[in-house]
Amino acid sequence: MTEETHPDDDSYIVRVKAVVMTRDDSSGGWFPQEGGGISRVGVCKVMHPEGNGRSGFLIHGERQKDKLVVLECYVRKDLVYTKANPTFHHWKVDNRKFGLTFQSPADARAFDRGVRKAIEDLIEGSTTSSSTIHNEAELGDDDVFTTATDSSSNSSQKREPNTRTISSPTSCEHRRIYTLDPYPMDLYHPDQRLPRSYPQVTFPEDDEEIVRINPREKIWMTGYEDYRHAPVRGKYLDSTEDADSYVRFAKGEVPKHEYTYPYVDSSDFGFGEDPKGNVIKTQPPRAKSRRRKENGERSRCVYCRDMFNHEENRRGHCQDAPDAVRTCIRRVSCMWCADSMLYHCMSDPEGDYTDPCSCDTSDEKFCLRWMALIALSFLAPCMCCYLPLRACHHCGVMCRCCGGKHKAAA
């Protein structure tokens, strides 16, 4: 890119990490722009290039490793945006084509919402919109794509002698951990051996539960975990190895030790008896190796990569999750015939085509597509059952009787 502009960080309405792609019409494929590499791509509000005093929107991409501007494209009302797949979107302005390969479907959806928001503001003529497209209902705790620093910048934590601050990888809320020492050092001499104790750690906001951790491994959690990596907290808290320390999660006071030891009557021990026969073989129960799902706990879905609440997770909440009813409807109604016809006859150079039953009148092939579907229904009459079955399925999704459910990542 010859002309470089550096918009203010506050002017972005959405910003994600992606690989900028360029279209090669000679070979009919997409290739990385300027040698590839992860770039910070966002939609920001800038002054209109024509200098008429009005504001416009610019899609700005800057490669991370060398700060090279690899993408600059002004958003226009006639911008044609295509979602080829969940992680690759491309658009066309005049005769120029741009594409982005996102790192996750959540990034792609956030960028799509940002572009649509910019186009709506241009159509309405109001570019003073200060509302951001992010809200807690659509995005999770980790889906904040505005100017946020990487997790590596927050990984340094100050070590204190008695108080440490850590944060959960699924939340930015910080908590204090207080280590209670039941044996003060002032009461013992240096040469006196201290009795062995188990340090008690209290998390005031979590439910009461005993889990094991390995004290030989130092765990330092950062304040902002990358959602593409497995959570560190679940890795260490689910360990079943024997440990010398116990961590207790409690709301109030720390209860007493829950281990119960069997009582043996003193009459069983006599002179001349074999002491091996009186060995107590009962062992204390082991702590649970799996944490139960707490009330209001949020996890990330493996299908759509969005955060969800386990208590509110019902059918129809995840559009990307497998839906057996929807798959059965498409097979019974032979919709694969319509998909094959549209792919071979009405697809664009990238192989994308409109949904067979779409009612979008802005499509150039709207009338031709429906006429072809009507003609095809005479050869496959079962296609006429698709619309009624799809309407029933939609009602079932609204009633939470069918549809896909979120699935927590392991």
Swiss-Prot record:
Residue(s) carrying Phosphotyrosine: Y224, Y227
Source species, domain of life: Eukaryota
Domain KBD: 197-252
The record's account of how the chain is modified after translation: Phosphorylated on serine and threonine residues. Phosphorylated on tyrosine. Phosphorylation of Tyr-224 and Tyr-227 are required for ubiquitination. Ubiquitinated; leading to degradation by the proteasome.
Entry's Gene Ontology BP terms: negative regulation of epithelial to mesenchymal transition; negative regulation of ERK1 and ERK2 cascade; negative regulation of intracellular signal transduction; negative regulation of lens fiber cell differentiation; negative regulation of MAPK cascade; negative regulation of transforming growth factor beta receptor signaling pathway; positive regulation of DNA damage response, signal transduction by p53 class mediator
Coiled-coil regions listed: none
Quaternary context: Homodimer and heterodimer. Able to interact with SPRED1 to form heterodimers. Interacts with RAS. May interact with ZDHHC13 (via ANK repeats) and ZDHHC17 (via ANK repeats). Interacts with TESK1. Interacts with NF1.
Protein name, as recorded: Sprouty-related, EVH1 domain-containing protein 2
